Amino acid sequence: MSFSVEVLAGIAIELQRGIGHQDRFQRLITTLRQVLACDASALLRYESRQFIPLAIDGLAQDVLGRRFTLEGHPRLEAIARAGDVVRFPADSDLPDPYDGLIPGQESLKVHACVGLPLFAGQNLIGALTLDAMTPEQFEVFSDEELRLVAALAAGALSNALLIEQLESQNMLPGSSGVFEPIKETHMIGLSPAMTQLKKEIEIVAGSDLNVLIGGETGTGKELVAKAIHQGSPRAVNPLVYLNCAALPESVAESELFGHVKGAFTGAISNRSGKFEMADNGTLFLDEIGELSLALQAKLLRVLQYGDIQRVGDDRSLRVDVRVLAATNRDLREEVLAGRFRADLFHRLSVFPLFVPPLRERGDDVVLLAGYFCEQCRLRLGLSRVVLSPGARRHLLNYGWPGNVRELEHAIHRAVVLARATRAGDEVVLEEQHFALSEDVLPAPSAESFLALPACRNLRESTENFQREMIRQALAQNNHNWAASARALETDVANLHRLAKRLGLKD
């Protein structure tokens, strides 16, 4: 069997029929799998010494979420280095990255593999991988025929990446015009909710508008901020991060605007604040709703006039900073309650974005699980970490109140448990390895909350009571210290000091 002109023409026609790049990629690998009668095919994009799956056929869905580093996958490294068709014999010593990831064949290892590196000029932009359980499956196809397939795939991928680059406004005035692959943002997901979010990010990234990013705790608001910065003209300058919830009131102004020597006790030298550090770049203010009203007023002035004053200095400094802010609060309600300035809210929310909770993202759960499985595999030096069909169903049926962060922790914990019960360096995650509960923050009973040991003196009893109150407040507020301080009706700086004295933090 060999490729006829009709077969190659059919592949080219399928590429043109697709609606959008993703559809074309899927048509390409599905057609190739049919033509070559193989068990699995995948189109991968190359970036920063790793391969990122764009489309798959015949492989487990979580493959789309995995990131295959060259260091962790010697076969893919061989493909990247070869510059031509690479055939791996059935008895190859190099492990296949898809072992255990072909549905229905989880316990079997791939026997035949062909790798086709894809180039745009001299630049490696991706690879096409073809796998079969039959050792001699690809012997009937010549290298020249496979090179023709690679050329078709490379053309489709190169055009798609170039168009994506132009649409994202990464080809800015004054740039060299040379093709450069877009950086990976780790925003994994193909659900309608995530697709819409990515489109909105592309729209706003190239502008200079301030952006307010909303969403529940653990949804990935910081990744959204990174994607906006990365797609903006400011990407060559720094993205500076500040968690407003972790700022004691006494140092918050200095952290934001800097201070001069002698401004206060301990100010032994001049110090730049976050706004100065982010000059000509982007400042990401996480948990913006935790700022005091006094600091909100000073932040508003910077947004209005573009100048700052260091603490202890009468002079103003001009800064050119784009502000991205994130919160898990409903700032409209905070405005109505008098805890957030309405004028600052309107300044920040010129282009609001909402990061969907994981429970609304459908099969993205499996893609993200694949990503975290691959991370664990590399970190623990395992040959493979895969999800059983039962584990996939279990993850899809769970509500994920803690969102992506909870999923990450659940995968890491499951890998450790599975590794402890299985010899060797291959881990299969089963349903029983996940101890998932919708009651992430159980309400304590009055008895357990107020119970004190009977044999304590007054001081020890008081400290135990304080310790328990702080623990409960942190649990009920997602370990947010500022929110816990409000719940306990105390200053956040005092809460930090008390927690340290009680041994609750270092």
Swiss-Prot record:
Record-level Gene Ontology MF annotations: ATP binding; ATP hydrolysis activity; DNA binding; DNA-binding transcription factor activity
Q: Which pathway does the database say it acts in?
A: Nitrogen metabolism; nitric oxide reduction
Q: Please give the SUPFAM superfamilies that the UniProt record associates with this protein.
A: GAF domain-like, Homeodomain-like, P-loop containing nucleoside triphosphate hydrolases
**Domain called Sigma-54 factor interaction: residue spans:** 187-416
Record function comment:
Required for the expression of anaerobic nitric oxide (NO) reductase, acts as a transcriptional activator for at least the norVW operon. Activation also requires sigma-54.
Q: Does this entry carry the keyword Phosphoprotein?
A: yes
Q: Which UniProt keywords apply?
A: ATP-binding, DNA-binding, Nucleotide-binding, Phosphoprotein, Transcription, Transcription regulation
Q: Which domain of life is it from?
A: Bacteria
Q: CDD domains of this UniProt entry? A: AAA
Report residues binding ATP: 215-222, 278-287
Q: Which gene encodes it?
A: norR
**Protein name per Swiss-Prot or TrEMBL:** Anaerobic nitric oxide reductase transcription regulator NorR
4-aspartylphosphate-modified residues are: D57
Q: Which organism is it from?
A: Salmonella paratyphi B (strain ATCC BAA-1250 / SPB7)
Query: Where is the DNA-binding region?
Result: 481-500
Do you know which InterPro entries this protein is assigned to? AAA+_ATPase, GAF, GAF-like_dom_sf, Homeodomain-like_sf, NorR, P-loop_NTPase, Sigma_54_int, Sigma_54_int_dom_ATP-bd_1
Q: Biological process GO annotation list?
A: phosphorelay signal transduction system
| Family matches, as PANTHER family | ANAEROBIC NITRIC OXIDE REDUCTASE TRANSCRIPTION REGULATOR NORR, TRANSCRIPTIONAL REGULATORY PROTEIN
